[in-house]
Amino acid sequence: TVDKNGTVRARTDSGECTITATLADGTESLTCRVRVGDITVPIFATAGLRGDRTTLADAAALKGATPDSILLDAGDSLHGTESASLTGGMDMLSAFSAAGYDLHAMALTDFAYGTTRLVSDANMGSGPSLASNLLNNEGTAVFYRSTSWSRNRVTNGRYTVVERAGYKIGFFVLNDPAQAAVISASNGEFITARDWNDTAAEQITALQNAGCDAILAIVSTAPAGDWQKALLSQGVTAIIDGATAENG
């Protein structure tokens, strides 16, 4: 119905309906979709694939069959098979793009061919690559201002916001500084990691300021101790632990 003020109202118990409003003279119309009832945003994650692409078709099908879903990789997935090693990780990033991944978290093991090479390869991804507390030798986030193959996406390298079904879902990625200190790439590029808690606090604040309805921390390389409790107490809605087999 349309009242005298031009307010359009529709009623449905659940599901969705389409409303089209047209001016009396027929010169202009607007169509919008209205959804009623509980709306969820499913998040699917892979991790620890180590160069194995056999499950990516299933992941793509799962996302395609699930409205409003988000698909991501939580790290440790670029290297491990002969074909993946031949391309230094580019093979997997291209496969992620083809499967419709929304973002990629980078674990320490994903830097096996060096920071410079990985940043270049990350351009093959359709979604942003993130490593919030890993820094390059200029002291900025490794993936700061990295772009996608289509050149229409720029990331700050620390966090990203994905919008689904009217919700803003924020993501950031953490790696253990203690492990980063003992891992270096074969070409001599060393990985520098910022403090875990300081980085988490900064990303949570930034995502809250961005108006996120939920904030997810992706932990690609976990530290010792009760880190889950620490993250949740800072305002994280949920944690994706890339080191656990359940995400594979």
Residue ranges and their predicted role:
Residues 1-38:
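Extracytoplasmic soluble-region selector
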